[in-house]
Structures are given as C-alpha cells and as structure tokens.
Amino acid sequence: MPETSAAVRGGADLVLELPLPWAISSAEGFARGGVSILAATGVVDTLVFGSECGNIDTLSRIAEIFYTEPEPYVESLRCNLKKGMSFPIARTWALLQYAPSLSDDKDVLSSPNNILGIEYLKALMSRNSKIVPFTTTRVGADYHDKRLGTNQCSAIAIRQSVAAGHDLTYLASQMPENAYEILRTSLKEQKPLFADDFSAALQYKLLTEYFEGYDKYQDISSDLSDRIRNTLPSFTGLSSFCDLLKSKDMTYTRISRCLFHILLNMTKKEFETCKAEYYISYARVLGFCKDAAPLLTEIKKNSSIPLITSLADARQTLPADALRMLNQDILRNQIYLGHLALKNKKEMVNEYRTPIVIV
C-alpha cells in the first residue's frame, strides 16, 4: 500500500480506510463518509483541510446556505436550472442572488478543494458535531494544472507524467522526499493502473446488463441509463466512453464515477443501507506510526464503531451488516488487485495477507 506508506512516512500518525462507496462518491458523499469515521472514533476534536480559499469564515457561510437551503436560494437554483444552466453554474448564481455580499468570493465554487471543504463543513453541520474545522491555503500548482516544472506540481500533472512514461527524476524537488522515493520504488516494481485498464471489464458488465438497464446503480438516472445503452455500440475504452457520454449537465468526472458504480456493482440500495448505518459501520486501520500506538488504544476505548486491525479477526468481531459491507469492500479491492496482477503478469496479492503499514 504505497499511498498508506507515503502518508505515514509523511507525518500521519494513523491512516484509516474510507470505504469504497464513499471513496469514489461525490464530494458530498466523500466528505460525509470521512467525517463519519472521524466522529465515530470518539477522539477527534479538530478537522483541518486544504482549500484554495483559505478562509474558514467564507467557506462556513456558503456551507450553511447550502445545508439549510433557504427557500429564496432554492427558488433561484430551480429557476437557473430551468434556464439550461449546468448545476455548478446554476448553484453559484443562486448563491450570489441570495447573498450578494459574497460576490467578491464568486470564484470559490470553481475550485475543487473549496467545494470539498464546503462539504466537510456541511457534514459537520448535519451531525451537529463538536469537531472544530480549520482550513489551510493550498500552495503550489492549481488542482487542474497539468504543467510540469512548476513549484509543487499538481497530482494530475504527476499522474499524466507517469502514464506517459516520462523520466520522473525532476519530481524529486516538487514532492516530499519520502513520497517521491515510494513512488519511484513502486514504479520500478510494477506498472500502475489507469482508468482504461478496466475497459474490458466494464464493457463486459455493460453488455451483460444491456437489456435490464443500469438505473439500479448509484447516481444513474433512467435517462443516463438509456444514454449508456444507446452509446454502447461506440464503446472503445472507458475514457473515450466518458467523453461520449458527458454533457452540459453531466461532467466527465461524474460520468466516470457512474461507470465505476456499475463496474463495482454499487447499487442505490447499498448506498441507502450505508446511510441508514450513518455512513460508516467500522474503521479499518491501514497504517500507523509506532509512536502513535497509544492513539489506537484511545480509539478502542472511545469509538462507537469497531476498530479493525486484522481482517481475519473481523469475521468474529463485526456485526452481520458491517461484515457484509467489509466483504464487499474487500471484493472490490481484489478486482483492482486482480487487474494490477494481470497487467504486471504477477500473482494477485491476497488482501487478507497484506500487513498493516507500521513505521
């Protein structure tokens, strides 16, 4: 688990897994899942997140409007959508129409980390949580900046460079030393996976369920299901299929997320069950720093959900619903690991035998 290793070696005391339904969800689902885990541990009193804005008061004011949904704001949003605006643009204009004093901050909703930060704040509000939020200002390249050679280039730029097979030595000055060494070592050991590596599996899934449609899956409406079916004959790969399906009201990212919901069998029913369990029913430890071992002890004392340090032991300790959710996550992780093994012509890693990262 190179990501976990990079986090712990980079200074994280503890890394917990965000279950896959929320890890590949919208910003709202991602934030709700993350905040739910933190709240359930019983030991977290502060949440710090990065943002382009860097102003917690501005983000909190916007989050409160989005969370409470006052009628004038909702009516403006409804009217803007009827005019044919995409949802992000319609929401921004509705916000400014409701709160003109935010006009100087109209660009806040065009930045991904701001949007996620607002969702963290909404998640805290929804729980009436005592966790205190803070934000730090993002530095370096913008989230969507694909240029290399800038000071602290974006993750997108790094991923594209890896995909293109470029020499990565120049990244040493733009990444934390530990993270760079882990990336370099990992790439020497195996080829990484990209979205298009799942094209064949997705095409098979779409074909086998062609006649029944896809609207049982999370985030997929009957209209999108019909569009997928009608466009399926033009399928040549996952990425290009996203390009064919995207529209003014559905971004490439959202389409990609929907297709992975289909591939990984993530249904609306499953998401509703997760919500009924208040989003999270267990906390799985992926890695921790030796010096932070007392933190695990405190979580075990105070947590409202089981803390998993051994998958083998989880079968005896988890309630039936939680165990079912964990098993689904493991299966989906194995799908990823299986594709990784095929690409590298290696034996598939067994997640049950993968040790926790301890540094």
Specify the residue positions occupied by each region the protein language model found.
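N-terminal catalytic cores of NTP/NDP-binding nucleotidyl/phosphoryl-transfer enzymes
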Residues: M1-E3, R9
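Short glycine-biased active-site loop of nucleotidyltransferases that positions the nucleotide triphosphate
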Residues: V8-R9, R147
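Receiver (REC) domain switch/active-site residues of two-component response regulators
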Residues: D13
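Active-site cores that bind ATP or allylic diphosphates and position pyrophosphate for catalysis
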Residues: L18-V359
